[in-house]
């Protein structure tokens, strides 16, 4: 009986696509309203002044301005704010 029995297939062999999360704009950069600042899972960063949060926790600019990262409150939350651009250089 020189036959080889069929081997079982591997249970691995697949992977999910990368989700391209992370910071898209850094502190001090000038961005237009509607631009994505951070794509994240959960609230690693919180929305501050002039920043909105999408249903997938993406942070985006509500106004044209300069991005600023700050730590706020007793809980030391990492917060993103956008200081409105008025036309003069920062």
UniProtKB/Swiss-Prot annotation:
User: For this chain's UniProt record, which GO biological process terms are given?
Assistant: translation
> What residue spans carry the region label Disordered?
1-21
Q: Which Pfam families match?
A: Ribosomal_L27
Q: Which domain of life is it from?
A: Bacteria
Cellular component per GO, a single term: cytosolic large ribosomal subunit
Q: Which residues form a coiled coil?
A: none
Q: Which NCBIfam families match?
A: L27
Name the family.
Belongs to the bacterial ribosomal protein bL27 family.
Name listed for the protein in its UniProt record: Large ribosomal subunit protein bL27
Output the InterPro entries linked to this UniProt entry.
Answer: Ribosomal_bL27 (IPR001684), Ribosomal_bL27_CS (IPR018261)
Per the UniProt record, the source organism is Laribacter hongkongensis (strain HLHK9)
A GO molecular function held by the record: structural constituent of ribosome
* Keywords assigned: Ribonucleoprotein, Ribosomal protein
């Amino acid at each position: 009986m020189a036959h080889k029995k069929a081997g079982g297939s591997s249970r691995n062999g697949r992977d999910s696509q990368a989700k391209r999360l992370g910071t898209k704009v850094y502190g001090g950069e000038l961005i237009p309203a509607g631009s994505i600042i951070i794509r994240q899972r959960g609230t690693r960063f919180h929305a501050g002044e002039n920043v909105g949060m999408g249903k997938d926790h993406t942070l985006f600019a509500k106004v044209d301005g300069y991005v600023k990262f700050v730590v706020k409150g007793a809980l030391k939350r990492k917060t993103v704010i956008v200081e409105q651009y008025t036309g003069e250089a920062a």
